[in-house]
């Protein structure tokens, strides 16, 4: 948001204080400042001069030599302008001026000295097009010797305020509101209050009809006649331009001017158009689904039922608090208007912004929550400004409408001990009273007990509890004046947070050790995405009004990770990501919220890839990574069980079992799910239930499993057998483990194969077993003996050797 120092000076004498003092106080006690810049300082080097004489250039037919007077001295200018004559007042850029990327220098043109350049409005960046030098004859304020910056009311300092730092302060979203705050902080008087403007309404005028309902906090309208639509005066134009608002005409400009000055949006309708619909009868009501009409920005959005509209005779003429309709807008030939001043519930405006995608200056203020009692004072102020800005004889009917939220009182009770304890300093009752009264609170004391009546422009959402009073006192006094007190605390060994420790181990292992990238996602998603993993009836719906794609809390992390892969699938050939996140269920505590460690891998395999060998190799690679992680966190006793999941491919889905509990799963995402997420490559997804993982890790972490390395060479035995397509590969390794062969250290699957010479419905699985002897070197006889044992074991249990 941009604020003009010159404009704020209308309300309190800020220029008497000094810019450095103002900036420091804003930064310490009010909000963050993004920038402080003089407005168009380059125009100080462009002066208004009078052309005293014009002569032809001796060496160029298209050039003229002009002698000009700036009020104190004369100078010579060579110009090619054809629209100038003797006696004209024109802008002259003197040597040293910088206009855009051009610097004006004293030069010679065809042997004749030229001390500057006549300027057009386009060259001064005041207009996109111009037809020659800007002629200022007869324009109010155009005086010889005056700079163009002064002539245009551009001599000003602009404060660029960080909007995020005043989101909770709707009273600061205006020049008067900000000036009022600075006056309180700097002990300055309020010299003019626009909310106290007066106006004599014409009681004989026919007033508009306003249908009362509960769809607005406050809504008033007034008919205005004898309006003349002309360009705004320089003062109005300059102030709007300095705040980044496009100048349109004197009527529309006043509406924008009032909004920037007082923080209250207004709207003007062309009364002639409203009467053409059967008379002026305004109503605040909701849109019908699919309803549409043309807006001022030339769009015609299809409206939802939650959007609030302004209707005349039942027909939409504006999206309430957001934007007016094109047909009812003020035209160049408009002579009668209807002024609207209203306050709508901030929640309703937020819905309209979200649904239409339109974020106007008005809606930004409405969504913060405005004080409803300001609607009538704003009408009186706007009428005074219209009269000043080109409509000297206008008349207005008495406003009609309703106010459903009359002024309420918010009283906060606390005591001096509470305030001093929170701030960490000792303030007297007088100190506290002085600060709060400067901030427009009404204060009374009963002993050490304080009662503060909150000013109406702060009581809606801002100051409501004792802690808010403490903040007001602290920031006004200045947090920089409060001494830092060292924290007094016992030195104790911190309690170990096992969950956090294991989470760090997981992140380190997967990111540093395996090359995964961590991602962060919101917990909001669409209801249909919860169908992937569980009963949608158990979905936790978000009570706030949210779009459909963010209407529930997720019940697993799979949708979030698949969307991450979709976003990145065209940028990387291989994607490996993981996330720590929570899933939510509409069931009693403590099972209503669970934390998961989930991961997804997308190798460079198209979703239509049919080479089972490649797919199995990828799957085994990821499975081996998970097993190495389990070993890293000292979980050695586990097995994989075949268990289908609705989001996994039916032939590639495993459950991880530890201590007879399922703690996770792993599998290829089902092709139908890949298609629904528009994924082009195969995806392997896995998830571990983190609380269970922490519990098992806590049990195992202190158990020593260290084995002294053998000084003798290790040996390996490979064996390949046929098993069913859906048979668990752990069956054979479990059989071998139960044989308790002394030298057997571990065994695992290192390859699988199906098709070719392998019978239909079967697959060839190759196992590798590592042998370690701590007493002597392996002999060929002992290795063969163990190998024969394994072959016999396979045959005994119905497995066919390959």
Swiss-Prot record:
InterPro entries: aa-tRNA-synth_II/BPL/LPL (IPR045864), B3/B4_tRNA-bd (IPR005146), DNA-bd_dom_put_sf (IPR009061), Fdx_antiC-bd (IPR005121), Fdx_antiC-bd_sf (IPR036690), NA-bd_OB-fold (IPR012340), Phe-tRNA-ligase_IIc_bsu (IPR045060), Phe-tRNA-ligase_IIc_bsu_bact (IPR004532). One of its GO terms (cellular component) is phenylalanine-tRNA ligase complex. It catalyses: tRNA(Phe) + L-phenylalanine + ATP = L-phenylalanyl-tRNA(Phe) + AMP + diphosphate + H(+). GO terms for molecular function: ATP binding; magnesium ion binding; phenylalanine-tRNA ligase activity; tRNA binding. Pfam families: B3_4, B5, FDX-ACB, tRNA_bind, tRNA_synthFbeta. Residues 407-484 form the B5 domain. CDD domains: PheRS_beta_core (cd00769), tRNA_bind_bactPheRS (cd02796). It comes from the Bacteria. It is found in: Cytoplasm. The keyword Ligase applies. Keywords: Aminoacyl-tRNA synthetase, ATP-binding, Cytoplasm, Ligase, Magnesium, Metal-binding, Nucleotide-binding, Protein biosynthesis, RNA-binding, tRNA-binding. The keyword Cytoplasm applies. Residues 40-149 form the tRNA-binding domain. Belongs to the phenylalanyl-tRNA synthetase beta subunit family. Type 1 subfamily. Tetramer of two alpha and two beta subunits. This is Phenylalanine--tRNA ligase beta subunit. The lineage of its organism: Bacteria, Pseudomonadati, Spirochaetota, Spirochaetia, Leptospirales.
């Amino acid at each position: 948001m941009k604020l003009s120092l010159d404009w704020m000076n209308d309300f309190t004498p800020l220029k008497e204080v000094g810019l450095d003092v103002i900036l420091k106080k804003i930064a310490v006690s009010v909000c963050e400042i993004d920038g402080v810049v003089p407005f168009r300082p380059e125009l100080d080097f462009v002066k208004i001069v009078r052309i005293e004489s014009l002569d032809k250039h001796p060496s160029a037919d298209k050039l003229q030599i002009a002698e000009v007077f700036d009020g104190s001295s004369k100078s010579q200018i060579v110009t090619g302008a054809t629209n100038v004559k003797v006696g004209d007042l024109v802008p002259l850029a003197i040597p040293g001026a910088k206009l855009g990327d051009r610097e004006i220098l004293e030069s010679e043109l065809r042997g004749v000295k030229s001390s500057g350049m006549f300027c057009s409005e386009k060259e001064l960046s005041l207009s996109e097009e111009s037809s020659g030098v800007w002629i200022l004859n007869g324009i109010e304020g155009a005086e010889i010797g005056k700079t163009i910056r002064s002539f245009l009311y551009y001599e000003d300092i602009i404060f660029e305020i960080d909007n995020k730092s005043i989101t909770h302060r709707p009273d600061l979203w205006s020049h008067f509101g900000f000036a009022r705050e600075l006056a309180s902080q700097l002990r300055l008087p309020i010299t003019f209050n626009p909310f106290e403007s007066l106006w004599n309404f014409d009681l004989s005028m026919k007033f508009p009809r306003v249908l009362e309902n509960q769809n607005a906090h406050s809504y008033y309208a007034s008919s205005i006649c004898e309006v003349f639509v002309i360009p705004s005066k320089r003062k109005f134009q300059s102030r709007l331009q300095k705040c980044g608002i496009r100048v349109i005409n004197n009527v529309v400009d006043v509406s924008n001017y009032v909004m920037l000055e007082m923080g209250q949006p207004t709207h003007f309708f062309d009364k002639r158009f409203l009467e053409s619909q059967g008379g002026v009868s305004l109503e605040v009501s909701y849109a019908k689904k699919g309803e549409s009409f043309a807006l001022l920005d030339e769009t015609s959005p299809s409206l939802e039922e939650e959007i609030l509209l302004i209707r005349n005779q039942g027909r939409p003429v504006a999206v309430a608090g957001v934007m007016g309709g094109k047909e009812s807008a003020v035209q160049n030939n408009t002579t009668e208007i209807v002024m609207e001043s209203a306050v709508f519930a901030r929640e309703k405006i937020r819905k309209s912004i979200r649904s239409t995608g339109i974020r106007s200056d008005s809606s930004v203020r409405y969504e913060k929550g405005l004080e409803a009692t300001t609607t009538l004072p704003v009408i009186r102020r706007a009428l005074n400004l219209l009269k000043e800005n080109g409509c000297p004889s206008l008349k207005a009917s008495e406003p009609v409408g309703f106010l459903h939220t009359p002024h309420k009182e918010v009283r906060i009770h606390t005591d001096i001990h509470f305030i001093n304890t929170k701030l960490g300093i000792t303030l007297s009752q007088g100190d506290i009273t002085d600060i709060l009264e400067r901030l427009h609170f009404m204060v009374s004391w009963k002993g050490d007990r304080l009662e503060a009546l909150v000013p109406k422009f702060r009581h809606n959402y801002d100051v409501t509890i004792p802690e808010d009073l403490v903040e007001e006192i602290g920031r006004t006094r200045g947090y920089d004046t409060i001494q830092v007190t060292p924290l007094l605390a016992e030195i104790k060994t911190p309690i170990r947070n096992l969950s956090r420790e294991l989470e760090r181990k997981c992140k380190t292992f997967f990111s540093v050790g395996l090359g995964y990238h961590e991602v962060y996602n919101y917990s909001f998603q669409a209801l249909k995405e919860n169908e992937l993993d569980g009963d949608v009836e158990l979905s936790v719906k978000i009570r706030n009004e949210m779009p459909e794609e963010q209407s529930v809390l997720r019940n697993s992390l799979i949708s979030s990770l698949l969307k991450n892969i979709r976003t990145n699938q065209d940028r990387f050939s291989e994607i490996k990501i993981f996330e720590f996140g929570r899933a939510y269920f509409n069931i009693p505590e403590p099972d209503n919220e669970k934390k998961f460690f989930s991961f997804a891998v997308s190798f460079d395999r198209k979703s239509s890839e049919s080479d089972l060998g490649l797919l199995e190799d990828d799957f085994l690679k990821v499975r081996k990574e998970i097993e190495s992680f389990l070993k890293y966190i000292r979980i050695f006793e586990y097995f994989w069980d075949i268990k289908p999941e609705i989001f996994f491919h039916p032939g590639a889905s495993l459950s991880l079992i530890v201590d007879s509990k399922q703690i996770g799963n792993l599998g290829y995402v089902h092709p139908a799910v890949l298609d629904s997420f528009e994924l082009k490559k195969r995806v392997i997804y896995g998830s571990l239930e983190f609380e269970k993982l922490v519990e098992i890790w806590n049990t195992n972490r202190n158990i020593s499993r260290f084995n002294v390395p053998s000084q003798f060479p290790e040996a390996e035995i490979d064996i390949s057998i046929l098993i069913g397509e859906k048979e668990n590969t752990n069956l054979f390794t479990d059989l071998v483990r139960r044989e308790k062969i002394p030298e057997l250290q571990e065994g695992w699957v290192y390859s699988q194969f199906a098709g070719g010479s392998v019978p239909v419905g079967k697959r060839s699985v190759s196992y590798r077993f590592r042998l370690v002897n701590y007493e002597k070197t392996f002999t060929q006889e002992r290795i063969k003996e163990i190998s024969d044992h394994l072959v016999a074991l396979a045959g005994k249990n119905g497995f066919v050797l390959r």
